[in-house]
Design a protein with these regions (language model features):
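Hydrophobic packing residues in well-ordered alpha-helices of helical domains and bundles
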Residues: 54, 74-78, 82, 96, ...
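Conserved pre-motif C helix in the palm subdomain of viral-like polymerases
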Residues: 21-50, 143, 171-174, 178
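Catalytic palm subdomain of template-directed nucleic-acid polymerases
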Residues: 24-25, 61-90, 108, 196, ...
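Active-site palm subdomain of RNA-directed nucleic acid polymerases
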Residues: 33-68, 400-407
Length: 660
């Protein structure tokens, strides 16, 4: 913050560089929250107990007291807390704005909710029915009704602005909706949303999602929300909030045991199985949807970074830009290094294995090691590659000790790995899944470095007829069988993937048991599935409008018009009942343009489901999207030429007068 210089530039003009007398921070500087932590430390330095506590975020400070009555809490705040706060403000030159100070009693005793007052800086602050803290609106009884109403209001405002956009494809609209609207609703949902109980809140929140989905698909307003969600492949609101809560809980369980959040987690685990009228809170209720044993087995991810002054454990980590260069450099490293070790990982029948191989000059295996990593639902190929590197370092250490001689010169060792992502994760360690393995690699490399061994990591392309890499690949494949022969704990990333799969399975069950969307279920029996995004994704709005009518059954045909009382009969111009199947396959009035449709779609004409991009067979989510899109395009051309899917209401006479 001292000895800082700056100049002012405008176009070609620039002032001389001058010393900044009062050097502050630029707005948005990442140093701001760090410096505020030091600045606020004396104010916030209070123990958090069952009697109360204090916390702060930048310039938002909040103090809470827990007592038998509102009167008792107010007395302690006025006599103990406010004098200390005012003394800190005088000492630091700060000023608390009394007009921005809020007081709220969190109690369900109606008589105490607006009781008493406090005086700060000579101004009286009375209790209010709500208080806003970091964007979350608290109410007396923590029922969060006001916060949900505010979230709905803000999200609806953004959704209305979204409706004003023009010339966007469905996939673009969907992306904007998920980037701009859902974060407004989801903000701090883990605080106010109970995944098992908030039916009233969800009923109101569902209305926020319905409007944008109608806009995305250009659908009729009578289409059910569940059908719109399946067609746009957008998670229902309650499942999206549940997934968010589960991911947050899983992430919290990876924090070190010394972290303060663990006291709340352990309390929530004890309260998880409460029976009766005991107080509930969202964390404990959300834990009911998860497996505690699986959570306790997860890896630990330390949010604090590594010390920046630590020496680099590797002499070099080289990731070449192209395969040819990497092959040449790998051959050079093999000829120049005293010790060369290859590591690789492989998957087979749902299990992962890793292996390490060292070859002699005759390309014979002199040292090898195999590791059973575990099942793929708890481990990933990326982490298996990291485990291979970890055991490769131990192999280097072992070979170096076997070759100990009187020559005490520094040795060079190279580990060749065919995973770029594993090398990059080792080069740039962070607080991500697999952190413990990366830290173990760095620690092992530091120990090897202490033995005067210059250790290098280098990328070698896989399947390039490299004897060492091929040998490691074979051994890794042989090690990929049930079991686990290492000490690392299961990954957060795989647990998140498992939770996501469970959410999708629940969505599928709800869709299959729903009373809505019968027409769509007959057409497409594999929903919900991601390929519907590709069906609609690149269509212009007028084409998406046609496809939605065909697939949902809510359209301009007579059958639909009669069901809503817009027509007295459901007859086609040919006299038969006018349905989607009748128009596409049977109506004699459209025989001419139907011949062109049959030529373009071929065998798909045998099934209305195939014509409309649906399927009742095959592997879910992996259809032949190219041929399916071609078929749908031909059907949309036919539907447009038939002129059956546009409003056939009589046009009114134009108003040529000057009046209303």
């Amino acid at each position: 913050m001292s000895d800082r210089f700056a100049s002012i530039g405008f176009d070609d003009f620039r002032t001389e560089v001058a010393l900044l007398v009062n050097a502050g921070l630029a707005q948005g500087s990442p140093l701001s929250p760090i410096l505020f932590t030091f600045f606020n430390s004396d104010l916030v330095d209070q123990p958090v107990t069952f009697r109360g506590g204090a916390s702060a975020f930048i310039d938002d400070y909040f103090r809470w007291r827990v007592g038998r009555s509102a009167e008792e809490n107010l007395a302690k705040i006025q006599s103990e807390d406010i004098p200390r706060i005012e003394a800190w403000a005088r000492r630091t030159g700060s000023c608390f704005a009394a007009e921005k100070t809020e007081l709220i009693h969190l109690t369900r005793r109606k008589s105490e909710q607006l009781q008493g007052q406090v005086v700060i800086n000579g101004k009286t602050v009375k209790p209010s029915p709500t208080a806003k803290l970091l964007g979350v609106i608290f109410d007396h009884e923590l029922r969060w009704k006001e916060h949900v109403q505010q979230a709905i209001k803000r999200a609806t405002k953004v959704a209305i602005a979204l409706a004003g956009l023009r010339h966007l494809r469905p996939e673009q609209m969907r992306q904007i909706y998920q980037a701009c609207v859902t974060p407004v609703v989801d903000y701090s949902s883990t605080v106010w949303h109970d995944p098992l109980r908030d039916k009233v809140h969800l009923r109101h929140l569902n209305t926020v999602q319905r409007g944008p989905l109608i806009r995305i698909l250009s659908a009729f307003k009578t289409v059910a929300t569940t059908t719109l969600e399946v067609e746009a492949h957008v998670l229902p609101t309650h499942l999206r909030l549940r997934r968010r809560a589960q991911h947050t809980i899983a992430r919290l369980h990876t924090l070190p045991r010394k972290h303060p959040i663990w006291s709340a987690l352990l309390r929530a685990q004890r309260r998880r199985n409460n029976i009766g009228n005991y107080a509930r809170f969202p964390l404990a209720e959300a834990l009911k949807t998860m497996d505690l044993q699986t959570l306790d087995e997860l890896e630990t991810i330390d949010p604090s970074p590594l010390a920046p002054w630590q020496a680099e454990p590797f002499a070099e980590i080289e990731v070449a830009s192209d395969r040819e260069t990497a092959v040449e450099r790998a051959e050079t490293a093999r000829s120049m290094s005293d010790i060369v070790v290859y590591s690789d990982a492989s998957a087979r029948e749902g299990h992962l294995g890793a292996a390490v191989v060292a070859l002699d000059d005759n390309l014979q295996v002199v040292e090898s090691q195999q590791v059973q990593v575990g099942p793929m639902d708890r481990w990933s190929v990326h982490v298996a590659e990291l485990i291979g590197i970890f055991y490769a370092i131990s192999t280097v250490f072992k070979i170096a000790h076997q070759r100990t001689s009187e020559n005490s010169r520094e040795k060079t060792a190279t580990i060749l790995c065919d995973s770029r992502s594993a090398l990059q994760a080792t080069q740039n360690p962070g607080n991500k899944s697999g952190q413990r393995i990366v830290h173990a690699i760095l620690q092992a490399a530091t120990e090897v470095q202490a033995e005067r061994i210059a250790l290098r990591l280098q990328w070698v392309p896989g399947h390039c007829n490299n004897p060492g890499n091929d040998a490691a690949d074979r051994l890794a494949r042989d090690a990929a069988y049930p079991g686990k022969s290492h000490s690392f704990r299961p990954l957060l990333s795989r647990e998140n993937a498992h939770l996501h799969v469970n959410i999708l399975s629940q969505w599928e069950q709800e869709w299959r048991s729903s009373s809505k969307g019968n027409h769509l279920r007959k057409i497409d029996g594999t929903l919900p599935a991601t390929y519907t995004r590709k069906l609609y994704g690149s269509l212009p709005r007028n084409r998406a409008y046609l496809l939605t009518q065909l697939r949902t059954g809510h359209n301009w045909l007579s059958t639909y018009a009669k069901s809503f009382g817009f027509r007295d009969d459901d007859h086609c111009v040919c006299g038969a009942q006018e349905t989607v199947t009748h128009v596409l396959v049977d109506c004699p009035s459209l025989r001419g343009i139907r011949m062109e449709l049959r030529r373009e779609v071929g065998d798909a004409f045998r099934s209305v489901s195939s014509l409309l991009g649906g399927s009742n067979e095959g592997k879910k989510g992996k259809p032949d999207t190219v041929s399916r899109a071609k078929t749908v395009k031909a059907v949309l051309d036919f539907a447009e030429a038939s002129q059956r899917f546009w409003s056939r209401a009589p046009r009114g006479q134009p108003n040529n007068g000057n009046g209303n």
